[in-house]
Amino acid sequence: LHEEFFNKKYAIISPLILSTTYLWFDYSHLATQDIIYSCLVSIGVFSLVKIKSKDNKFYILLFGIWIGLAFMMKTFLVFVPLLSLIPYIFFKKNFLFIKFFWLGLLIGFIPFLFWTFSINPYLDKNIIFYLVEKFNFLSSKNTFTNPFYYYFWNVPVTFLPWSFFAIIGTIYNISQSKENKYILAFFPLILVGTLSIFST
């Protein structure tokens, strides 16, 4: 992503900065759903950025695939990054009408569908109903005690000292007319805002 937005010469800077952050250092050694889910979201963002025209069929296919795989990992939580990507998706909306996107979406959901049909015979009702009930329960019985602005201060503090540069860069990108602002500014702001509204 660094190479796509800036240049290849200093692309190593981003992973070096990431490796020094507390959250990455704390979670990178754990084989949890969150790590796999984060990787899938990163693949989705990368593939969306790489879509320059209708001829980029591989990346269009890949963007469809990650949605289904991420849904299998975290179910409805996949809509958080998708909502955050809406401005950029709208900017590149033409690829949504290409069959490779829908083919990728189908391929991505195949593991989930296979798991669903495998487990349903052992349940008294379809697994989808259980997932919806779980979602409704978490929404109505919210045990998330932190205030709505929790992520707005916690994320910058956790990523110190790099958060200072991130805030400056976000403000700068918003003022620019380039398409970079959809990923570098709008995406993280909408993502944090969405996480602040709904309990995770």
What are these regions (language model features)?
Residues 3-9, 44-62, 70, 173-174:
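Membrane-interface transmembrane helices that cradle and orient dolichyl/undecaprenyl
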Residues 17, 24, 58-65, 144-149:
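Alpha-helical membrane-protein architecture signal
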Residues 2-20, 38:
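Transmembrane-helix signature of polytopic, membrane-embedded enzymes
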Residues 23-37:
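Short acidic/glycine- and proline-prone juxtamembrane loop motifs at membrane-interface regions
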